[in-house]
Amino acid sequence: MASRHTRFRFFYRVGFTPWEGHPIGQSLRDLVEGTEGTPALPTGQALDVGCGTGDCAIYLARHGWQVTGVDYVAKPLEKARSKAGNADVSVNFVRADVTQLSQSGIGTDFQLIVDNACIHNMSGSDREAYVREVGAVAAPGARLFIAAFPPGGRFGVPGIDRAEIERRFASGWTLLFTGDEQELDGRKTPAHYYLFQRHA
């Protein structure tokens, strides 16, 4: 089986990117913009892991966050930089692997980390490294937002269920909220979101 690096480089090369171009999910918008009963999360340093062509990173920058977006494929990062320029926002897009964040030079004090459909594509060993590395770059009290398909939710995506999410983040994180997210791929496939807080 091809590695995830090889698969995604191939997908971008041939233009098969069905995960791109969907609206920002309501659960993330509620966190960033606030709701009638809940204020918006205070802005600061944000990290978008597996940022692709940058839609989420640009959205966060438009709402006052200082954003770093990471992806290990060069082609989408080129497009992301162009889109950020057209949107007149500043985002630091970095080519890096989410399983090696602490070696990428991006810093270690992110107050918000966003994963829109990254961890659910990974193997078990990569997920273990992901959890370690996300924890290494998170500030005390940081929020981690994950939107992911469950197993069997989308063809070609391994998926990840709530039990595994909770098990992997049991040390060093507290699960604040979880729920359904219908807009991860334009309401075609059920998905779930998880909001964690890093222990101080």
Question: PLM features: residue spans?
Answer:
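A conserved beta-strand element that flanks and buttresses the S-adenosyl-L-methionine
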Residues: 114
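Short catalytic micro-motifs in class I SAM-dependent methyltransferases
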Residues: 117-121
